[in-house]
Each structure stands twice: as structure tokens, then as C-alpha cells.
């Protein structure tokens, strides 16, 4: 005898999802780890590079407080650099990536989803000082991808993070860039060994790093 596992699909809309978020436990009722739902990025008429995109969002972790952490299953079509120059100075807080995600990408999400996103406190140790930001869109940290033990060497500046449940295996960390196949994508953590680099996830799902000014895949996250 053996079991056949089948996925269950729930038909819903943003209004119902928001009601569950406000009145019940979103993770228990609708969005457990591994759940997927579609989101779209509207085209920006003022920027020819910002075209309409259909993405799949995936629940990667649920916090002890019941907050649902979501990361897009594959990268956006548009790749982007962490900074305009090869530097990780200022970490996530001062990065061009952070500004781009929260000023350019966020407004392209459905208005109903924007209203549901909970700003998240990001903490990093930069040059011996704790730096905090409040962000609606963010990149995962090295710790959230690979765990605290590996981060002690690669990204000791990560503060208060824990590994996201879904990313415990290499296979779960592999992502594609549309039209390019499996690709490497950025993390928000400065690479500890070089001031010119940030950490990233290589195309095979393992840890790597890259020059901050190089364009790589972008798989952003948000909290519900």
C-alpha cells in the first residue's frame, strides 16, 4: 500500500485574504509553508524596462507570532545590481537594491496586496554598529537561506534572523530568471570577506558571492 499526495487548491481573492489576515490566523487557515499564489507586477509607463510580469509567490516560513514570510518562487525578469558601484558599504540600508524594490517595484504590486504587506524590521551589524530599516519589500538574508552556522563565516552581520523553513535544502533554493534558466540571485547580506561583494545564491542552490555592481537575479520577499 502507498499514499498518493495531491495538492488542494483554494479559490479566493484579495478581500477574503485580507479578512482572514485581520480576523484569523492566515497561516493556519490559508497560507501554510509551501503554499503558492499568483501576483502581478504592472508595467510602468515611465520606464520601458518595467514591463508587466506574472510571478508566483511562495510561503517560505511562518514566524512564532504567526507572520507569513513570502518570497517569489522564481526571479523577476529584470535583473538588478545591489549597488551602482562595487561596494557593500552601508549594507542593505544604503543599497541601491533596497531603494529600487521599495520605490519602484512595490508600487507595481496589486494595491490590495500592498495594503496587506506588513513592514518588517531588518537588522544588520555594519562597521560595529547595529543598523535597522523598516521595509515592505526585501531580499532574504544569508541566514534565512543557509542558516546561522554557515552565516557565522559568510555573513556575521545578520542580526536576529533564522533560516526560513522552505530553504533547508539546496533544491528548494534554486530559482530561474525568465528566458535564462536557473540563475544566481542576490541576498541582502554583505559578504564578510570583501567590501566589494554581497552574498548570493548560486544557480545550483549553494552559497556564493558577487560584485555589488553586477546585475543578478532578484527574488524579493514580503511579510503578511
Question: Which residues are covered by each model-predicted region?
Answer:
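Collagenous Gly-X-Y triple-helix signature in extracellular proteins
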Residues: 1-224
Amino acid at each position: 500500500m502507498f499514499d498518493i499526495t495531491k495538492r488542494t487548491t483554494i479559490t479566493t481573492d484579495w478581500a477574503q485574504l485580507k479578512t482572514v489576515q485581520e480576523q484569523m490566523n492566515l497561516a493556519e487557515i490559508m497560507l501554510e509553508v509551501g503554499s503558492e499564489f499568483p501576483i502581478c507586477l504592472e508595467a510602468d509607463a515611465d520606464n520601458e524596462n518595467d514591463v508587466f510580469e506574472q510571478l508566483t509567490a511562495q510561503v517560505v516560513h511562518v514566524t512564532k507570532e504567526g507572520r507569513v514570510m513570502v518570497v517569489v518562487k522564481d526571479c523577476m525578469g529584470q535583473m538588478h545590481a545591489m549597488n551602482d558601484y562595487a561596494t557593500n558599504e552601508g549594507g542593505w540600508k544604503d543599497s541601491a537594491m533596497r531603494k529600487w524594490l521599495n520605490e519602484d517595484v512595490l508600487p507595481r504590486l496589486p494595491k490590495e496586496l500592498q495594503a496587506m504587506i506588513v513592514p518588517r524590521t531588518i537588522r544588520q551589524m555594519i562597521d560595529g554598529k547595529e543598523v535597522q530599516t523598516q521595509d515592505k519589500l526585501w531580499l532574504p538574508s544569508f541566514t534565512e537561506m543557509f542558516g546561522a552556522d554557515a552565516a557565522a563565516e559568510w555573513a556575521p552581520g545578520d542580526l536576529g534572523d533564522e533560516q526560513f523553513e522552505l530553504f533547508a535544502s539546496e533544491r528548494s533554493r534554486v530559482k530561474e530568471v525568465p528566458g535564462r534558466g536557473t540563475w544566481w540571485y542576490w541576498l541582502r547580506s554583505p559578504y564578510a570577506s570583501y567590501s566589494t561583494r554581497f552574498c548570493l545564491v548560486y544557480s545550483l542552490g549553494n552559497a556564493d558571492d558577487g560584485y555589488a555592481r553586477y546585475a543578478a537575479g532578484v527574488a524579493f520577499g514580503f511579510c503578511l
